[in-house]
Regions:
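Conserved interdomain linker/interface between the two RecA-like ATPase lobes of SF2 helicase motors
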Residues: 196, 208-273
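Pre-Walker A (Motif I) flank of P-loop NTPase domains
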Residues: 67-73, 97-99, 147-148, 207-208
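Walker A/P-loop
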Residues: 67-88, 185
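Conserved Walker A/P-loop ATP-binding site and its immediately adjacent core
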Residues: 79-84, 91, 97-118, 156-159, ...
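Helicase-associated low-complexity/disordered flanking segments
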Residues: 1-63, 67-71, 125, 245-248
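Conserved motor-coupling elements within RecA-like helicase/translocase cores
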Residues: 133-151
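Conserved helix-turn-beta segment of the N-terminal RecA-like "Helicase ATP-binding" lobe
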Residues: 108-131, 225-233
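SF2 helicase catalytic motif II
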Residues: 150, 154-158, 164-208
Length: 273
């Protein structure tokens, strides 16, 4: 009985019930309580309930509920970055403002759209994405003006804002996905230029930024990135090395029309799967 009680206490302590504050964000006095309830209920109703936060998510999840905290978050692949973005989006939407998610890859945009639609459609929010050719159609402009949650590639968004910078005036949260893809290649430079434009807008102070990444530099480079995203406001990045699964190294050996995968299980020697 004691063990069961301790397990339940631990589960509750790290659940969304405890992590999501009861008090609404600024502007969310009328809607937040109901949206909070629907958000938790939607995740609970999934085939495998998703109410407990993993160790990798806990610090970032708590900070993501503070709409004034610009975040830089580095979590390993499959360690729960999307849930951090969803919590930040919930707080923004409850306050009556829209959400923009920038994803550097088209395939990632489509995947992110599906994930956010699954989470936020039951709450009554619209979700759409913009990717493909850099041109802007009337339909694309309508998406940017009207959808509650927009997922866009840097190229598409940059083109849209050069045509009409007011398209994101009522955006309250910008999520920069795969933040480590800001670098020296042509596509990475485009991403960096877009981020710089967003940070230098006259209304940048009214818009929260959350940067998510699986890989971030150490030392001074990380400090510089955090200071850049936070516009030099003091604050630490969130980092975790915890993963929900174990990693194993292996060798794939191709043999004609079949393959053999050899895992190296530390002292156990090769393993044939």
């Amino acid at each position: 009985v004691r063990l069961c009680r301790n397990m339940l206490d631990d589960l509750w302590a790290h659940s969304l019930h405890e992590t999501l504050p009861s008090d609404p964000p600024e502007g969310g006095e009328e809607r937040y309580a109901e949206l909070r309830r629907l958000f938790i209920a939607s995740l609970y109703a999934r085939k495998s309930a998703e109410l407990e936060l993993w160790p990798s998510q806990r610090e970032a999840a708590k900070r993501s509920t503070d709409v004034s905290d610009d975040l830089v978050v580095a979590l390993p692949t499959s360690a729960g970055k999307t849930r951090i973005a969803e919590i930040a989006a919930l707080m923004c939407l409850a306050g009556g403002r829209r959400v923009l998610i920038v994803t550097p890859l088209r395939a990632l945009s489509a995947q992110t759209e599906r994930t956010f639609r699954q989470t936020f459609s039951p709450l009554g929010f619209s979700v759409s994405s913009l990717y493909g050719a850099s041109g802007l159609s009337a339909g694309d402009e309508d998406v940017l003006r009207s959808m509650d949650i927009i997922i866009a590639t840097p190229e598409k968004l940059d083109f849209a804002l050069r045509n009409d910078a007011s398209l994101i005036d009522d955006i309250g949260l910008v999520v920069l996905d795969e933040g480590h893809l800001i670098g020296p290649t042509e596509r990475e430079i485009r991403y960096e230029i877009l981020v710089q434009k967003l940070l230098r807008r006259g209304d940048a102070g009214t818009r929260r930024i959350v940067c998510l990444s699986a890989i971030l530099p150490d030392g001074q480079q990380l400090e510089d990135l955090t200071a850049w995203i936070r516009s030099d406001v003091e604050g630490e990045p969130v980092r975790s090395s915890w993963r929900p699964t174990r990693q194993r190294f292996g060798t794939l050996v191709w043999q004609g029309d079949a393959a053999r995968l050899n895992y190296d299980l530390e002292q156990q020697g090769p393993f044939l799967a």
